[in-house]
A protein has these predicted regions:
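Glycine-rich hexapeptide-repeat left-handed beta-helix
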Residues: 6, 10, 14-22, 30-53, ...
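Conserved short histidine dyad/triad with adjacent acidic residue
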Residues: 25
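Phosphate-/polyanion-interacting regions in eukaryotic proteins
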Residues: 68-70, 74-80, 84-159, 186, ...
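A charged, amphipathic alpha-helical module
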Residues: 165-179, 185
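Core alpha-helical transmembrane segments of integral membrane proteins
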Residues: 179, 183-202, 210-221, 226
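Long, compositionally biased intrinsically disordered regions
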Residues: 373-621
Length: 621
């Protein structure tokens, strides 16, 4: 911003000749090289500072207009250099505007008393009728929000963490609204109590109230026609367009929300895409997608998720209100017309079909089909492992991360073969084996915690989980530096630390895309409660630090599993693991080809498409 000086008598006279008026000309200050020729029909109230008008502004591709202020009313405003402000139907009140901005055909831009800009807004996610469990602020990430959500029942933790966020926000909250450099705002009705960062664009919006738009030259925010957003923070690279309506939301990096999608008290992170439908009290982690008008995501936590058309959840059980919620672990899909009666907890990379009423908990059965069929909930364990859909998903997500390297607050570990999933599959295999042993081999159906498992599905489920474990262990052995291999290649072998081994061998968790040992999460929670973690930056750094050691923790878990299955982690065991992994890869890729062949045989896919996919399947995936 400039150093501003008072207007000269000559400048005041020229401004008056141009149809300008000031409540008090002595309260108007300008840049040293200010040119009054470029101000016409401007009403000035309160303290106003105006920059220079040397450049032209590109208002549309190839169409430039000289900077200046025309047909506007300003009150307590600071304006940087080379801005074009024209046709302000109402007024601009209590705002600071940066350099080279274009503001045209806007009704009102104003900061009022008590403005929060969407910062430190507490919302209730999952339990629609519950106390607020996520506090929104500009540095919110998927894993930090997941941590808040997971431990919201711990009052001491919640209050302490919320206070750390409030301290962070209060130290940075401006006294009035800010519009950064190179911002475009056009054809928009109301912007009230908003911070709009550099290079953001708002075109045709209905109303933005108490919002923060985060952006810079590498990754800006775009707000389009008909959008209404209230008490919402919109992160770098996101776009909200075509009549979307947001209230009490956080929209993360590179998210797209459009086509009249409506959301309240919901958070969306990293590359999520929401169109046409509705979300309420929803946690949508990285790569969540819903494209259909008839789909409702309510009271649910999802990530790497795809909602089929007419997907619906119910968070009312009877008459106690919308207090129930569910978790669909990473990679889950809901098929067209599916209905899930909450509470429910669905295992990773599963597919829900039909109307599921039995409140299933399938966390120990990843990669499954969960089928609602009348009063029954049928479980087909592990079936999704050998489908075209899974293969396409695990290969497409890495290619669809649209965030620039500078703006990746949400940590996304895209490993589909991870301790988090493998530990669940190992437990699932044990349960299936016990059911087979306990109930005998002659049963046509097995029953487990309200789930019905057909005999053939139980037996194939055991095989699928054996395949999965072999794939995982083979992958880890391939990547790990083993003592014998290091010696043979003349490399220095650095063993895992005792701490890495201890943490990696224990239970694992998924915090909104961050895979880490449960022990590290517990340590972080304890540190927040006892005050050893003193500020929100330390919390964020601790999560990043946990991610940086994933490879060591992963290897520690894998070696622990090897000792369980092979007694010792010896060269002979490693050789056997590699052999079994190669066999599993061949079986897995062949099963996926057969799954694709089914669709081709039905005549639903042309030959070229089928052959292109079949030839693209890599056994090394």
């Amino acid at each position: 911003m400039n150093d501003y000086r008072p207007l000269t008598t000559e400048e005041i006279e020229q401004l008056q000749q141009n149809g300008c008026w000031a409540e008090d000309w002595t309260s108007v200050n300008v840049a040293e090289d200010f040119n009054p020729e470029h101000m016409r029909q401007v009403m000035l109230y309160g303290e106003v500072c105006i920059g220079s008008f040397d450049k032209s502004i590109e208002v549309s591709p190839g169409f430039h207009k000289h900077s200046g202020i025309r047909n506007a009313t300003l009150h307590n405003v600071i304006i940087g250099d080379d801005c074009l402000i024209e046709n302000i139907g109402g007024f601009i009140n209590n705002y600071t505007i940066g350099d080279e901005c274009y503001l045209s055909n806007v009704s009102t831009i104003e900061t009022t008393e008590g403005a929060t800009y969407g910062e430190a807004n507490v919302i209730s996610v999952l339990n629609e009728a519950g106390d607020g469990n996520i506090i929104s602020f500009s540095e919110l990430s998927s894993q930090l929000a997941a941590l808040m959500l997971k431990h919201s029942h711990n009052k001491e933790f919640r209050e302490t963490l919320f206070q750390l966020v409030r301290e962070y926000v209060s130290s940075r909250l401006p006294e009035r609204g800010l519009i950064g450099n190179n911002v475009k705002i056009a054809n928009t009705k109301e912007i009230i109590n908003c911070i709009i960062n550099d290079y953001c664009e708002v075109n045709g919006a209905e109303r933005l109230s108490d919002c923060t738009l985060l952006g810079d030259a590498t990754s800006s925010v775009y707000i389009g026609t008909g959008v209404i957003a209230e008490n919402t923070i919109i992160d770098h690279g996101a776009s909200i367009t075509n009549g979307a309506n947001l209230q009490d939301c956080f929209v993360g990096e590179a998210c797209q929300i459009n086509n009249s999608f409506t959301a309240s008290a919901s958070v969306f992170f990293a590359n999520s895409v929401m169109s046409n439908g509705e979300a309420c009290a929803a946690f949508c982690g990285p790569f969540s997608a819903s494209h259909h008008k008839s789909s409702l995501i309510i009271g649910s936590q999802v990530s790497f998720y795809n909602a089929g058309s007419a997907t619906n959840f119910s968070n009312h059980a009877y008459k106690m209100g919308p207090i129930h919620w569910g978790i669909l672990e990473r990679g889950t899909k809901t098929a067209s017309g599916s209905y899930l009666f909450l509470p429910a907890h669905i295992g990773a990379y599963s597919v829900c079909l039909g109307k599921t009423m039995a409140h299933p908990d399938t966390t120990s059965f990843p990669f499954s089909y969960i089928i609602g069929e009348g009063e029954k909930t049928i479980l087909i364990p592990g079936r999704n492992l050998v489908t075209v859909g899974l293969y396409r998903d695990i290969n497409k997500w890495p290619k669809r991360d649209l965030r620039p390297a500078e703006h990746r607050k949400s940590i996304i570990n895209q490993e589909w073969l991870s301790p988090f999933v493998i530990s669940k599959a190992t437990e699932g295999r044990r349960i299936l084996q016990e059911l087979c042993t306990t109930c005998g081999n002659q049963c046509q159906e097995y029953h487990y915690q309200g789930l019905t498992i057909p005999r053939s599905s139980l037996l194939s489920g055991i095989r699928f989980y054996d395949m999965l474990i072999s794939l995982y262990l083979g992958q880890v052995i391939k990547k790990a530096t083993l003592p014998a291999a290091a010696e043979e290649e003349g490399q220095e072998y650095t063993p895992l630390s005792e701490q890495a081994i201890h943490n990696g061998e224990e239970a694992w968790t998924d915090l909104g895309g961050l895979l880490l040992p449960q022990a590290l999460e517990s340590q972080l929670v304890e540190g927040i409660i006892d005050g050893t973690t003193e500020d929100i930056e330390s919390v964020i750094n601790a999560l990043s630090e946990a991610h940086s050691h994933y490879a060591d923790f992963n290897q520690a878990y894998a070696f622990s599993l090897i000792r369980q299955l092979y007694e010792e982690a010896t060269p002979a065991a490693f050789s056997l693991i590699e052999t079994r992994a190669d066999e599993a890869k061949s079986l897995w890729t062949e099963a996926i080809r057969k799954d694709a062949q089914k669709e081709y045989d039905l005549g639903d896919v042309d030959e070229d498409t089928f052959l292109h996919f079949a030839n693209s399947i890599s056994p090394a995936t």
